[in-house]
Design a protein with these regions (language model features):
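N-terminal transmembrane alpha-helices
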Residues: 8-40, 44-45, 61-73, 77, ...
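Transmembrane helical elements of multi-pass membrane transporters/channels
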Residues: 19-35, 141, 175, 204-208, ...
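Small-residue hotspots at the loop-to-helix junctions and early N-terminal turns
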Residues: 47-58, 135, 139, 198, ...
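Small-residue-rich hydrophobic transmembrane alpha-helices
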Residues: 50-110, 149-168, 274-340, 373-395
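Hydrophobic transmembrane alpha-helices of multi-pass small-molecule transporters
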Residues: 62-65, 179-183, 209-213, 286-289, ...
């Protein structure tokens, strides 16, 4: 991948790039299994349990995406300082992102613990009593895990900024082994149902968080935090981190709020539609694991190239990595369309009605993913790595409210559309985002941004 001659030494030779990408693919595959294991094992309790977990996970994803966006801001700043050979500022930016995420995650956790019932009722309105009971149980323990998720995301992003993706992969492996083992023991061994699934996820996330923070403090780590004094707020660095993190956080937050609005709409279609949507969401996430991994890699690669002043290399690597993301999307989604979708659905205890709806939306997902997913989600990370987060935020917010929310509500409320209509709104969102991001990339405006 790095045979092209540059005016200077390639920053990411093929072996180094492979060493970055392969653990990221494994990490993404492992991280998805937490949601899959919960949904799969909880499905033995019944559709009401699956629906309750699904509704809460929609909100959980909102929080995780906002925290990931803030971590991305820190990773972009740290990677550019690393590329610029400013290790002191890189370490200082690492400390600041840990501070930011500690404060944010603790505040959100406190709000959810106190007001979880009001939040669920306000977002999803009137839902079945059994679904609400399961959702409240799962929501409480999910909230307690937010600080662990926040600090884990920060630590993992900082390791990736250094080009070390093995640490986050191994932490994800430990997290998944504990989660799946805990699910098996607590759900099937002790009959704890949704409570068991939530408790297993909480314990696994706490262990992963502790492991990443411990490794971040090892003497050989470039971004090691040098004492608690380093965690004191630094206005200059916080501003630089938030210049990327806030637009990305608003983008991800508004994106998930849009999904919450759509989830609320989905809940009006009945328990079968909620369960089908949950299973389709969980299984379809697997199909874009390679493209998601490339999306994480470009933050490190493009960030370090631009930090070193190598715009030519940044463009070259960005193009090749985007093509790699497309290759992964084609292989995964075509395989699923012809072979894997029906097999995947047999793993879940769905009613015939829910299974038919899930299969329908998954196959449409396969078709649109091979053309639009990488340019809609991998490509904007290239722009963010350059500090062009405000543009990606603006496009994503407009597209989400017009297509993902507006179109869906129009189809369901005015034309009595079903679950597929909601997913079609999502696909239109991808198309619009892809066009805007591709035009921005080709014109080169993203290269004019400054982070450090």
């Amino acid at each position: 991948m790095t045979s092209t001659k540059f005016h200077s030494q390639p920053l990411f030779p093929c072996r180094q790039l492979t060493a970055l990408l392969l653990p990221l693919i494994a990490e993404q595959a492992l991280s998805v299994t937490i949601g899959l294991a919960d949904t799969l094992m909880v499905s033995s309790v019944g559709e009401a349990a699956v629906s309750g977990v699904s509704l809460v996970d929609t909100f959980n994803t909102l929080m995780i995406q906002i925290m990931s966006a803030l971590a991305t801001g820190g990773a972009v700043v740290a990677s550019q300082y690393i590329g610029h050979r400013e290790e002191k500022n890189a370490r200082a930016s690492a400390a600041q992102i840990l501070f930011i995420l500690s404060v944010f995650s603790l505040a959100v956790a406190a709000v959810v613990v106190v007001g979880r019932h009001a939040i669920l009722r306000g977002i999803f309105g009137s839902i079945d009593a059994d679904v609400m009971r399961y959702a409240e149980t799962y929501f409480l323990l999910s909230a307690l895990s937010y600080p662990f998720i926040g600090l884990y995301n920060a630590g993992a992003a900082l390791f990736r900024a250094q080009g070390n993706s093995k640490v986050s992969m191994m932490s994800s492996l430990v997290m998944n082994v504990v989660n799946i083992g805990g699910n098996a023991i607590l759900i099937f061994g002790f009959g704890m149902g949704v409570l068991g699934a939530a408790l297993a996820s909480l314990i696994s996330r706490a262990i992963a968080c502790i492991a990443v923070l411990f490794l971040l403090q090892k003497p050989g780590c470039m971004l090691r935090i040098e004492g608690l004094a380093a965690l004191r707020p630094n206005g200059r660095l916080i501003q630089r981190i938030l210049r990327v993190g806030i637009p990305a956080g608003i983008e991800n937050g508004m994106f998930q709020i849009g999904k919450l609005s759509v989830a609320s709409l989905t809940s009006t279609l009945g328990t079968a539609a909620i369960a089908a949507n949950a299973v389709a969401n969980t299984t379809s996430t697997f199909l874009n694991i390679p493209a998601s991994a490339v999306g994480l890699a470009v933050l490190t690669v493009v960030g370090q190239c631009l930090g070193a002043g190598e715009k030519e290399q940044a463009v070259w690597y960005a193009r090749r990595l985007l093509l790699l993301a497309y290759a992964g999307a084609w292989i995964m989604n075509l395989s699923a369309f012809f072979f894997a979708d029906k097999l995947a659905l047999t793993l879940f205890h769905l009613s015939p009605e829910a299974q038919a709806m899930a299969l329908q939306v998954m196959q449409w997902f396969n078709i649109f993913s091979i053309f639009f997913w990488p340019s809609s989600f991998t490509l904007p990370n290239i722009l963010r790595a350059a500090g062009d987060a405000s543009f990606t935020m603006s496009v994503s917010i407009v597209s989400m409210w017009v297509f993902r929310v507006g179109f869906c509500y129009l189809m369901v409320l005015c034309f009595h559309g079903q679950l597929l209509s909601i997913w079609m709104g999502m696909f239109l969102d991808w198309v619009f985002r892809s066009v805007c991001f591709m035009v921005r990339f080709v014109r080169g405006k993203w290269l004019e941004q400054h982070v450090i």
